[in-house]
Amino acid sequence: MAPTPLPLEQMSGVGGYLPAGQEGGPRINTMSMSMLIDFIIQRTYHELTVLAELLPRKTDMERKIEIYNYAARTRHLFTRLNALVKWGNSVSKVDKSSQIMSFLDKQNMLFVETADMLARMSRETLVRARLPNFHIPAAVEVLTTGTYNRLPTCIRERIVPADAITPAEKKQTLLRLNQVIQHRLVTGKLLPQMREFRIKNGRVTFEVKHEFSVALTVMGDSQNVPWRLLDIDVLVEDKETGDGKSLVHPLQVNYIHQLIQARLVENPNALSEVYNCLHYFCQSLQLEVLYTQTLRLNYERLDDNNITVEEYVPGVKLTVSYWRDLKSELGYRLTVQSDPSEIGRPLAVVHVPSLGAKESAEVADRAVRSEHLSMERLIVHTVYIRSVSRLSDLKLEFQAFLKDVDFNLQGTPAILTVPVLSPCLRAEQIHITIDTHTGMFRCHVPKHLDCPITDEMQEALNGDRSKLPSLLSELRYWITHRRCEKTLQHLPATATDTLTFLTQPEQELLQQGRHKIYVKLHRHPNIILVVQLKEKSTMANEMEYTFHLGFVAFQKDEADVIDDSAKQLVSVVAQPPSDIPKFFTKLMRLIEFDTFVATHGPGTEVDAEVSPHKRKSTGDILAPPAKQQKTIFPAYFIPELAHVVAMCDEKIPFMNLAQTLSKHNIPHSGLQVEANATSLVLKILALPQPGKSATAAGQQPQQGAASAAGTAPPSGSSAFPRIEPHVWDDLMRRVLSISVRSQTNKNSQVRIWVVEFVFYSTPLQSCHPKEQGSRRTVYLTYEQANHDFSKTVEELLNDWSKIVYLYTLVYDFAEQLRNKRLALCDMLVVKSYSYMNLLLGYGPKKEVSCNIYWSVQSHGFRLTFVGGMSAVNAHSMMRDQLAQHLNQQHSLTQIAQILHETYNPMSSIAKLPVLPFLGIPRPQVPVLSFCMLAQSPCLMRLTYQAVYCLELRFRANRLVSIRDGASSRFERNVIEEFTPIQGLKAFLSKYVDESAAYRGRAPHEDDNPLSPIGMEDNYGGPSSVTGVSAGGSSPFLGAGMRGPQSPRDSGLRFPAPHTPPSSSNPHTPASPHPSAGGGGAAQSHGNFNLTSPPAPHMPHPSPGGLMPSSPLNPQPSPHMVHSPGPNTLYMQSHQDSPFTAMSPANNQWPGSPSMPRPSPRPGQSPEHKSTGGSVVTGGPDRGGSRGTLNRPWAGAVPTLLTHEALETLCRPSPHPNKDINVTDMSPLERFLGCVYMRRQLHRNIQNEESLTALNSTEPGVVLFKVDGLQCQVMLNQMHMQTLHLKITQLPPPPDKPTFQLSPDDLLVIEQYFDTRVAAPPYRPNSLHSICRLLNLPAQVLKDFVQIMRLELKPEFGGDQLKWTVQMCMRMPPSAVPIVPSGNACVVLGRMKILFFLQITKIPFNGKDWKDSPSLVLPIVYDITMNLTQMAERREQVPSPMMTAASTLLRRFSEFNSQQNQCSLFPAITDLLTNLQLATDMPQPPPNQAIGPPVGVGVGVGVGIGVVGSSPNPMMPMQQLQPQVGPQGQVGPGGYPQLGPNPGGPQ
C-alpha cells in the first residue's frame, strides 16, 4: 500500500521550514526502495533472533503462539513490500507529477512559515525581550584565575569534609591502644577460663570453647576508663535440629550487650562479670538444646519405653532414663548438670548406675564438651559403654565351660563372637550383641540366619543361662549338617536328615536323632552313605566322622516284597516299572567304612610325622620335607566327606561294570589304581569273537538280527564276513591291552567311559603322519548316565565287532595291495586305518576319499565319500549300491577297482545340472533337470525332466554303454513313466570311437573263450555283483530269458562259443549267417558276448527266427508287425510304422500292449518307404544305416562310448549357434532339450485346431501348416543340438488372392525361432506363443515380423529410437499379472491379440546396460478396429512410466492418419521413439518391477546375429512399412473380415 502523507506539523524542520537549496528536491517523507528492503530484512532478522532466544524459556503452547504471530507479521510485511514493488514498476509517470507537486508544496510552505514566524516574533518574543544583569566580578575571577574564592564559610564547612588522618597516624594509634589493653590485662584480675585471648587492632577477643566469644576495648589510657564491650558471639549450636540458624535472637544479644556494658562501669572485676554472665547464659542454652533434642527424639523416633525425661530444671540439670525394659533396681539414667560447687566449670554427666570416672569423662567429652552438642550421641555412647560392660561379663561366663576358645569382643555396636566349631568361619560364629533400645541380648549366626536354635539361645541369654552348653552342642551339630550340604553342593550327591522308612531299622545308628546324615548318590539311587557325627572328647569344638555304606530298596507298601538281589551292586533281575510310585525306603544291608583307610588310600596326601628328637635316616633324605605345604580348605568344606563321596561315586560304576563283564563271561583283572595314583582302571583280558558273543543276557545271533532288520543277503552269500582262524589269531597277537577308565566330558560335564585299545602296528600301512609308529591306540567312549551297564557292555562288544570285521577285510586287502601284479598302489592310496575306519584316497590326484566302516545298525559295511579341494566325489550317488556289493563279496580289492574304473564316468555324470526348474510341465511345479538313479555299482539311470531316461552301464577298458531307459530291460513294452528318446542312437553315434571298441580285444584272445570280466560284464571290474543279473539281460530276448544266477556268470548270456568271439559293440561287423527275414542289421544287445548264433540247446527261441516283431529284426515289408511303442508321437509320420498295426505276437507276450495304438492318419504319401530293410554286409558302419538310427526303438540298443566321449557329452560347452548367448550347457542337455521341444511341438499341433499336421517322409521332422504357411521343424543333423524352423509360403488360391510375406520376412521368423524360441532354457510355452503368432492374419504377422527384426537387429532402428524392444514368449514374473507367470503370453480371443513387450532404455554417455531401466508392457491389438493400446487392470494403480506409455499409444491411435495399414508396428515405433524417462520416477508397485530384461534371448545385446544368410539384405527402417495386399476397404481398418479366432487361450 502507498505511504500515507504526514500533516505539516509533523514534518521535519522548524515548523515545516525547509533549508535553502532543498526547495526543488523530492517530496518530504520519502525513502529509497533499497533502504526500505534493508529495514524490512533487518527487522525480520532481529525479531527472529529475539524469538530464538526467548522461546526455550516458554511452554510448548506459548512457543507455538509466538511462532505463529511471528510468521503472520512477517508474511503481512512482505506482502505489503511485494505490493509496493509491483506498484513501483508503473510509477514513472506519477513520479514527474509528484516532483511538481512537491516543488509547489515547498514553495507554499515557505511563504506560510515565513508569515507565521514573523507574527510569532512580534506577538510573543519581542514583548518580553530584556538584557540580564551579569555577575561581572565572579566571571572575571573564574576566567582569569580559574578559581573562585568568594564562597561563604558556612557553606564550606557544611559541604567540604575535614582532612582525614594519615595511615601512619592510624597505625601508630592502634599500636598504642594495643599496649594500653595489654597493660590493663596484666595489672588486672583474669579468670582461668578467660586465659585464651588475642589482642589485635586495638581490641582484645576472649573465647571460651563451645560457649561464647566476646570482644572488648578501652577508650583511653587511663586506669579509670571502663572497658567498652564491642561484640558478643554465642558459640552454642544445635546442628541436628537448628538447620544452621543462630539460637539467640539479635534483640537478645543487644539486651545482654547493654546489661554487661552497664555492669562494666565502675566494676573492679569487670572481666569476671563478663564471664559469669555469658557462662551462665551459655550453659542454660546448652541444657535447653539437650532438652529440646530429647523431646524431639522421644517424639519422632523413640517412645517412652526407650528414653524418658525424668527431670528438667532450666539452667541447672536434665535427667534422662533409658533401658526401661530391664528389671534393674536403680534403673539406667543419666543427668547433665552444672557444677554446683564451682560455677565456672562446664556441664557434667552423672550416670546411674555409676560408671568409672574415665568412662564418664569420655562420655561428657564426646557429647557435651564438643562442637556437636547432641543428646543422641550422649545416649549412644553411654549405651555402648554399658554394652561392652555387660558383654564382658557374659564372656567370662562362656569361658567357664568353653576352654581354649578364642572369643572376640569388638566393633560398634559391640559384638561378642563365640566360635562353635574348629576351624570356624567368622560367619559361622555366634554373634552376640545388645539391643541399643531395650538393652536385651541378641544373638545370630550370619551364615545361617534361618537357624532355629538361635531363638532358644537368645531366650537363655536373657533368662536361664544354664542351658547354654546344651544349646551350643545342638548348634554345633546343626552347623555341621549345613557344612555337609555345602560340601556336597558340587558333588553328585545330596545330604538329607531323614529317609522315608516304612518301618524303622533296627540298627542303633539309624534311630531318631540329629547326629547323623544320609547322603544320596545321584548316579546310584540304590546306595546311600550314612555319616555319623560325634564331638571329640578332648576338644568339644571339633567333630569326628564315621561312614557307613547302605544298600536300600524302594517299596510302595508293606506287602511289597523286596528281592535279595537288591543287596548286590547290580540287580540280576530288572524290576518292571510299577504303576504306583515307590516312596518308602527299606535298608537291605549296612557296611561300615574304616575311616582311616578310606581317607588315606591312593589319591590322598601323605601324612609324614617326624619326631623332633629323631635323626633323619639316609632314606628320609630323598623323602619330601616334613613341613610340606598342606592344602588349605575353607572351614565349611569337609575334605573327609568329599573324599568318601567322590570315592564311592567313582568306584561303584567300576564295580557295576566289572560285575556286568563277569556276567557276559568277559575276563578282567578287577579294579586297579594306575601308576602315580592318576586314575582308576579296569583291565579287560580278552574279548570274544563277534560271531560267538551271544550270551544268556538276551543277545540274539547277529545273523537273525540281520534278517529281522530287513538286510538279509540273497541266498548263497553270508551277511557277515567269515573270520578265518589265522586272521583272528593275528588280531589277538596285535591286541596289547584293553583298559577302561572313567572321565568327565569337558563340554557337557557328563561322566563317560573311555575304553583304550592298544594294538601293535597294523597290517595295512597308511600315509597318515600319526600312524607311522608301532603303537596304535583306539579310544571308545560310552555314557554312564543311563545306569544300564549291560547296554554299555553290548556297545563295547558292538564296537569290538567293528574292529574285527573291518580287520578281516583289511587283512586280505593288505596282501593284495602288496601284490604288484594287481597294481592297486597305482589306483589308490591308504590315507588312514584306525582299526575302526579305513580311509582310501583315489582319483587322478588321490584327493577324493572313501571311508569304509562296519555298521552295527545295518549289520554290514557302510561307505562314505568325501570330495577333495579341486574335485567332487561323484560316488556318493551310488553309495548304497557299493555298500551292498561289498557286503556280498567282502572284497576290498573289487571295491578299489570299481572306484578306480568308474571315477571318470561318474565325475562326468556329476557335471550335469540337478537344479529344479519351474514351468516345464506346469508353471508352478518344479522338476529336476537331471536326476541320477544308481541301480548297481556299474548301472546308472539318468532322468531328464521326469520325461526321458538314459541307462548307462560302465564297462571295462574305459567304455560306457548308453541306451534308452524307457525300454524295459525285463519286458518288451515301454516303461510307463518315461518316453522313448527319438534320435538318441543317431546322436550318440556322433561320439562313438571305433578304435576304442577294439582296444579291449587282444590278438591272442581269438582262440580263448571270453572271461566274465569282459565288456559285457555288469561291472567291468574284477567280478560282478551277485543277484543283479537282471541288469545284464535284454528286453528283446523273450519273457523267459533271465540272467544266470552264478556270481561269476552274470555277464555271459550263452555258453562258451566254438567260433572266434567278436566285440559286443552294435557297430561291429555282423557274422556271416543271415538273420531271419533277410533284414537284420546285426544289432546285438549289450549282453551278447558274440555275434554268432546262440547254441541250439537254449531253452528259448532264437531271437533271429522266433521274434517276428522284435526291434532287433526290423522287417522291410509294409505288412510287418511290431510291439507297441512307448508313445505314438514319433510314429505318426511313418505310414508303414509297425506301431500302427495290430501285433500278432500278443499270444507270446500277453502283457506287452500297454499303450493304445493310434489309427493311421489320412493323407500319407504313397512314396513313403520303410528304411529298415537295408542289410549291412560290409565293414563296420559307424552310425548304422540311416533308417536304423532313426527308428524309435533304436535307442534301446546300447551304444559304446569312451570315457572321454562321455566327458565331452556331459561337460558344459558353448552353444553351437554363436548367435545364442546363453550359459554353457552340456551337449546331452541341449539334445534332450531339443527332443523335448520337438515332442511338445508335436503335441501342440495335435491339440491346436488352427494347426494342421502334415506327413513327413523324413524321420524326426515335424511338418505342419497354418493359414498360407507350411512349417518344417527339424534337428540340426550336424550336431543334433539345435532346432531349426523352415517356412515355405503356400501358393495362394487362384480365386482368393491373399497377402504374401516376403522371403526376408520368412527368414526373420526362422531366425527368431532358432535364437529365441528353440533356445535354452527349453520351455514348451514359447512354442505355444510362436504357433499363435504364425496363425495370425498375414497383415498382422507382417508387423510382428518387423518387431522380431528390430529385436534381432537393434541397429536397424536408427538413432532416433531411445528404447530397445524384445518380444516375450513366456509371461515374465515382473509384468502385470494378467497371465500366470511362465505361461504363453500371446493370447488370442475376440479378434484381439494380447502380447507383452519388454523395452529397455538405450544407455547414453558411456553408461552400462545394467543401469538402464526396463519395462514390460502388456499390449492389446484390436484386429477389427486396427487399434493398438495397453492392457490395464482397474484395481491396480499403474506406475508413472506405464501411464506415460499408455498415453503415447492412445495419442498415436487418435492422430494416426494411415487407416489402410496395420497400426501395430508404427505404434510400437512411435513408443520407442517418444517415450521419455522421468528423472524422479517413484518406485513401481510389486507386480511391475523395473529391472533387466527377462526371459531367455530377450536381453539387450543377446542374439544380435541371425542364423544363415539371405540373398537380399534386410530392409532398412524406412522400408519396414507393411505392404497391404488387397486395395480398398474390405473390412474395418482396411483388413478382410476374419472369423472367430480358433487359437484362443488354452
Swiss-Prot record:
<dbReference type="InterPro" id="IPR055113">
    <property type="entry name" value="Med14_RM2"/>
</dbReference>
<feature type="compositionally biased region" description="Low complexity">
    <location>
        <begin position="693"/>
        <end position="717"/>
    </location>
</feature>
<comment type="similarity">
    <text>Belongs to the Mediator complex subunit 14 family.</text>
</comment>
<feature type="short sequence motif" description="LXXLL motif 1">
    <location>
        <begin position="51"/>
        <end position="55"/>
    </location>
</feature>
<keyword id="KW-0677">Repeat</keyword>
<dbReference type="Pfam" id="PF25069">
    <property type="entry name" value="Med14_C"/>
</dbReference>
<feature type="region of interest" description="Disordered">
    <location>
        <begin position="1000"/>
        <end position="1193"/>
    </location>
</feature>
<dbReference type="GO" id="GO:0003712">
    <property type="term" value="F:transcription coregulator activity"/>
</dbReference>
<dbReference type="Pfam" id="PF22981">
    <property type="entry name" value="RM2_Med14"/>
</dbReference>
<feature type="region of interest" description="Disordered">
    <location>
        <begin position="1512"/>
        <end position="1546"/>
    </location>
</feature>
<feature type="short sequence motif" description="LXXLL motif 2">
    <location>
        <begin position="468"/>
        <end position="472"/>
    </location>
</feature>
<dbReference type="Pfam" id="PF22983">
    <property type="entry name" value="RM8_Med14"/>
</dbReference>
<dbReference type="InterPro" id="IPR056877">
    <property type="entry name" value="Med14_C"/>
</dbReference>
<dbReference type="GO" id="GO:0016592">
    <property type="term" value="C:mediator complex"/>
</dbReference>
<dbReference type="InterPro" id="IPR055107">
    <property type="entry name" value="Med14_RM8"/>
</dbReference>
<dbReference type="InterPro" id="IPR055122">
    <property type="entry name" value="Med14_N"/>
</dbReference>
<feature type="compositionally biased region" description="Pro residues">
    <location>
        <begin position="1153"/>
        <end position="1163"/>
    </location>
</feature>
<keyword id="KW-0804">Transcription</keyword>
<dbReference type="InterPro" id="IPR056878">
    <property type="entry name" value="RM5_Med14"/>
</dbReference>
<dbReference type="InterPro" id="IPR055114">
    <property type="entry name" value="Med14_RM6"/>
</dbReference>
<keyword id="KW-0010">Activator</keyword>
<dbReference type="GO" id="GO:0070847">
    <property type="term" value="C:core mediator complex"/>
</dbReference>
<feature type="compositionally biased region" description="Low complexity">
    <location>
        <begin position="1515"/>
        <end position="1527"/>
    </location>
</feature>
<dbReference type="Pfam" id="PF22984">
    <property type="entry name" value="RM6_Med14"/>
</dbReference>
<keyword id="KW-0805">Transcription regulation</keyword>
<feature type="compositionally biased region" description="Low complexity">
    <location>
        <begin position="1061"/>
        <end position="1075"/>
    </location>
</feature>
<dbReference type="GO" id="GO:0006357">
    <property type="term" value="P:regulation of transcription by RNA polymerase II"/>
</dbReference>
<feature type="compositionally biased region" description="Pro residues">
    <location>
        <begin position="1093"/>
        <end position="1102"/>
    </location>
</feature>
<dbReference type="Pfam" id="PF25065">
    <property type="entry name" value="RM3_Med14"/>
</dbReference>
<comment type="function">
    <text>Component of the Mediator complex, a coactivator involved in the regulated transcription of nearly all RNA polymerase II-dependent genes. Mediator functions as a bridge to convey information from gene-specific regulatory proteins to the basal RNA polymerase II transcription machinery. Mediator is recruited to promoters by direct interactions with regulatory proteins and serves as a scaffold for the assembly of a functional preinitiation complex with RNA polymerase II and the general transcription factors.</text>
</comment>
<dbReference type="Pfam" id="PF08638">
    <property type="entry name" value="Med14"/>
</dbReference>
<dbReference type="Pfam" id="PF25067">
    <property type="entry name" value="RM5_Med14"/>
</dbReference>
<feature type="compositionally biased region" description="Polar residues">
    <location>
        <begin position="1125"/>
        <end position="1149"/>
    </location>
</feature>
<dbReference type="InterPro" id="IPR013947">
    <property type="entry name" value="Mediator_Med14"/>
</dbReference>
<protein>
    <recommendedName>
        <fullName>Mediator of RNA polymerase II transcription subunit 14</fullName>
    </recommendedName>
</protein>
<dbReference type="InterPro" id="IPR056879">
    <property type="entry name" value="RM3_Med14"/>
</dbReference>
<keyword id="KW-0539">Nucleus</keyword>
<feature type="region of interest" description="Disordered">
    <location>
        <begin position="692"/>
        <end position="717"/>
    </location>
</feature>
<feature type="compositionally biased region" description="Low complexity">
    <location>
        <begin position="1020"/>
        <end position="1035"/>
    </location>
</feature>
<comment type="subunit">
    <text>Component of the Mediator complex.</text>
</comment>
